[in-house]
Amino acid sequence: MSTFSLKIIRVGITVLVVVLAVIAIFNVWAFYTESPWTRDAKFTADVVAIAPDVSGLLTEVPVKDNQLVQKGQILFVIDQPRYQQALAEAEADVAYYQTLAAEKQREFSRRHLLGIQALSQEEIDQASNVLQTVQHQLAKTIAVRNLARLDLERTTIRAPAEGWVTNLNVHAGEFINRGATAVALVKKDTFYILAYLEETKLEGVKPGYRAEITPLGSNRILHGTVDSISAGVTNSSSSADSKGLATIDNNLEWVRLAQRVPVKIHLDSEDQQYLYPAGTTATVVITGPNDRDPHQASPMTKLMHRLREFG
């Protein structure tokens, strides 16, 4: 074979290798930048801020931080003797006005039966007015009694649902004000994912699509279903002036960063058992209408999914 032929073969091989490399790099880049995935995803759950409806000293806190509690379980108790005394006083007032109202009712009935032949109309009207006044006062004391009873019931704060007590920052002996958050309750079986996907990747995301979730630092792959896509995000380029007119930012960057849009993903029920704290990070890949068969993925695809963990 001549030297010229060898040169042609070498050049051809080199060109072929370069072309294949360019194609591979292009495919990798397109796969990496256009496929619907993100490393910016967070585990989230329904969280209830537990705050008392009454004020007073904490007498009991029978739970511990990060404890799993059942629905209706006592979380803490507030100064019941004070509210028991208030209820007893209110019940005494109700009993007094019930007796007084019965007495005034008998007096009015007696005067009404006697009629204007024995009494003046003014005396009959006066008895009626006194009866109405006492009845109104009785209704008021009953309302106060019912409120005192409700306050006493609410001195015992119970878990509204099954979940984990977290950030418990109160202890027995402390004074707590009405409406002051004492603890957070993370509801069990309510965990979901908020994946912040770039707007350029939303074309491949639809409600009902399946998703793979890989917690940061874990090899376990969880599965879920896209529930919804956020209907809007903050417009940082525009604001309203005092007249209500839009104020537009005059600066337009040469490099425009894609806006991130929250996508809510519900975890499958079998994956709810793996407890990853709300707020921790995960990588999310939207696989389309169906789950991806891990055995059919090419080595390059597997490599790309692994590289996503590193950015």
UniProtKB/Swiss-Prot annotation:
Signal peptide positions (record): none
Keyword Oxidoreductase applies: no
Transmembrane domains' residue ranges: 11-31
Keywords of this entry: Cell inner membrane, Cell membrane, Membrane, Transmembrane, Transmembrane helix, Transport
Gene3D superfamilies for this protein: 2.40.30.170, 2.40.50.100
Membrane topology: Single-pass membrane protein
Family, similarity comment: Belongs to the membrane fusion protein (MFP) (TC 8.A.1) family.
PANTHER family: P-HYDROXYBENZOIC ACID EFFLUX PUMP SUBUNIT AAEA (PTHR30367:SF12), P-HYDROXYBENZOIC ACID EFFLUX PUMP SUBUNIT AAEA-RELATED (PTHR30367)
Function summary: Forms an efflux pump with AaeB.
Protein's UniProt name: p-hydroxybenzoic acid efflux pump subunit AaeA
The species this protein was found in: Yersinia pseudotuberculosis serotype O:1b (strain IP 31758)
The encoding gene: aaeA
